[in-house]
UniProtKB/Swiss-Prot annotation:
This protein's record includes keyword NADP: yes
Family according to the record: Belongs to the sterol desaturase family.
Full protein name: Very-long-chain aldehyde decarbonylase GL1-6
Record field: transmembrane: 46-66, 100-120, 127-147, 183-203
Cystine crosslinks: none
Amino acid sequence: MASKPGPLTQWPWHNLGNYKYALVAPSAAYSTYRFVTASSAAERDLLNFMVFPMLLLRLLYGQLWITVSRHQTARSKHKIVNKSLDFEQIDRERNWDDQIILTALVFYLVSATMPQAQVAPWWSTKGMVVTAVLHAGPVEFLYYWLHRALHHHWLYARYHSHHHASIVTEPITSVIHPFAEEVVYFVLLAIPILSTVATGTVSVVTANGYLVYIDFMNYLGHCNFELVPKCLFHVFPPLKYLLYTPSFHSLHHTQFRTNYSLFMPVYDYIYGTTDKSSDELYERTLQGRDEAAWRPDVVHLTHLTTPESVFHNRLGFAAVASNPLGAAASGHLLRAASAVASPLLSLFASTFRSEANRLDKLNIETWVIPRFTSHYTSKSDGYKVSRLIEKAVSDAEASGARVLTLGLLNQGYDLNRNGELYVVRKPSLKTKIVDGTSLAVAAVLNMIPQGTKDVLLLGNANKISLVLTLSLCKREIQVRMVNKELYECLKQQLQPEMQEHLVLSCSYSSKVWLVGDGVTDEEQMKAQKGSHFVPYSQFPPNKARNDCVYHCTPALLVPESFENLHVCENWLPRRVMSAWRAAGIVHALEKWDGHECGGRVTGVQKAWSAALARGFRPYDDHHHPGITHDGRGGL
């Protein structure tokens, strides 16, 4: 919203959500019907028929720019504005497709009211020339002065400040405006197209090509990384006045009173509003930042979970990624899209960077193994996955990372013995491998209700279940188990004085269930009403009961100073981070010198105290004091 929203700020279909596309459906259906039933090629309205395909292509084109831009800003040394992007901006820009819908509706209206548009050929050279001349002349000139007017305090406060709320721009920032402002832009940019229609020189390629040109230039100017090669300006020096660069327009968003031009800087040069640092910023960003300034200190290695998670990734759909996995209302559309995108992931032979954050001078990156959970559980794919992880470890060390955390199934015992395999193979490994067990156990203990005397432990035997059991026994909390194999496995690894707190039982009467991987719905149905299900696994259990309390997987709230966080980590809420991921950050902040993988454990109390001291806070979607609550959630 603008600082003082004026009339017609909201778009007319604001309350329709994704149902806004239904506004285009009648015209699209009628257009297709007319095209198919036309008796001859001469009667077919090509311009009208192409409206809906162009809508789909422009949506895809916009998404491709989002993906490429986010990939570049997560890793590129050519990033222009190195400031933080937040959830507020993502929410503000989630309606970037509104202007595409408006374009389709306007095109249908023009086709219905102007007979000249109904006989448009595929190509017209005259139409192309008319469009180019009118854009470079009236459109660019009028836009320049309109833009300057919008920076007058009255119009700026009521309209244009909405667009300028985004200091760090993304490609779609270019089309984020109040409805009234967007309508004025539409009238202005319609001059070339309507002129070609009126003069009978319109063509399908000219009209739609002009839309593609506008999209390209808009997205280029707001992508926040420099990609225009210097050689273009050497070959044709006047191009400097006809083509703006991402760095040129970024100065308008940081300085506000310079570089007003639409796409052609010539008018800024004519009227003296060119920012004096434009050339210097272009040269500097094209050359790139010093490598030492953007190398990662901490790398969190994760992987995709379900096919839908492809679009929940930061490089996917921005609005979807800014909410917990599974929260999107259009889940069926995501599944359909993932059916197309998922097979392409097999082409990736290494990890890709999806996110870059910063905390207390630490550069933190998230790398993604392009494989799904199903690949990790498949025996035939296990070796390939392990090789991908090992390559990521080598790449992290080569990049200078001090710590690498293994997220989700990247730390499986059968896969790599909780990360120990890579330390054994590379004894001189400088990057510390952290599986996050200590902090994850601490987060679980914090979720257990205060006053609990006994718990029921279910799931598969693994490192975290052992450390969790040991921590509970030290606190003299009885740990019951119904699985004899799990009981025997854990018992033989506990000291004799601790074993008395371990009980093999056939009862499911405990009010607190600690659930790991492998817990079935049938087992959950045996719990008493009001029981607490506290996961200690990376993945949340299936919620089979409506009368029980389900806690989140081990996680913490990130410090307020944690920068550039604008996506949700899997199923966790905003600004909440899994304990395994947070453990690596704490490890680096504390400059601990050892690994936490295999049989090595940092220490539950040590990890928890350090996390709290560094600004992390306990998180539980069902708030209550933990079993050893000290007023801050401490252990």
